[in-house]
A protein has these predicted regions:
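A conserved mid-protein helix/loop that constitutes part of the nucleotide-sugar donor-binding site
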Residues: 8, 12-31, 43, 48-54, ...
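A short alpha->beta transition loop at the rim of the catalytic pocket in nucleotide-sugar-dependent
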Residues: 76, 83, 105
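Short glycine/serine-rich donor-binding loops of glycosyltransferases
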Residues: 95-98, 117-120
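Donor-sugar nucleotide-binding helix/loop cap in glycosyltransferases
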Residues: 101
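Conserved acidic donor-binding segment of nucleotide-sugar-dependent glycosyltransferases
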Residues: 122-124, 128-135, 144-149, 164
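A charged, aromatic-enriched C-terminal amphipathic alpha-helix characteristic of glycosyltransferases
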Residues: 150-171
């Protein structure tokens, strides 16, 4: 199984906690939504910040553009319905969600945390790394993938290939 790279859908996943930076992602999505109103973002997870994040979504007028969704048993189905995965963490370890998304051919846009994302994503080859906590650049890189379907497709293919290096038989 692999992604529907042509869908107008981006996803993120993780706990609704400060570390995950979903507040920054929602702010970035406000910029994306102005340029690409046909695109939607779904953030899968649970946690203490859900009400605060929903309030931010409402205040930014993103009610129909950005959805907070419950954690699902099979996130693979959600990867397959999306064209872009976004990791907005302030800090991150290995970032298993990145490797999972890449395994389904979903190109990723991520903050360049010192560990994890910078070790997984090969910038401009199988995904895009963004200066840590730079909301405007995050929005810009998401828009770049939206605007460049062929780049998105190629990065998705490379993501599937490059993530193989993390498979148990190759570690």
């Amino acid at each position: 199984k692999h992604t529907d790279i042509l869908s107008h859908h981006a996803i993120a996943a993780g706990r609704y906690a400060p570390q995950k930076g979903f507040d920054m992602l929602i702010s970035a999505w406000a910029i994306v939504a102005r340029k690409h109103p046909e695109w939607q973002l779904s953030i899968y997870g649970e946690g203490d910040l859900k009400d605060q994040l929903q309030k931010q979504i409402d205040e930014l007028g993103l009610k129909d553009k950005c959805m907070l969704c419950h954690t699902v048993a099979n996130i693979a189905d959600k990867y397959c319905m999306s064209s872009i995965f976004v990791l907005s963490s302030r800090y991150e370890g290995f970032g298993l969600v990145l490797a999972e998304a890449m395994a389904y051919g979903v190109p990723c846009v991520s903050f360049a945390c010192p560990h994890g994302p910078s070790d997984i994503i090969r910038n401009s080859e199988d995904g895009l790394l963004v200066e840590k906590e730079n909301v405007e650049e995050l929005a810009d890189r998401i828009c770049y993938l939206i605007d460049n379907e062929s780049v998105r497709c190629e990065m998705g293919k490379k993501a599937r290939e490059n993530v193989e290096r993390f498979m148990p038989e190759n570690v």
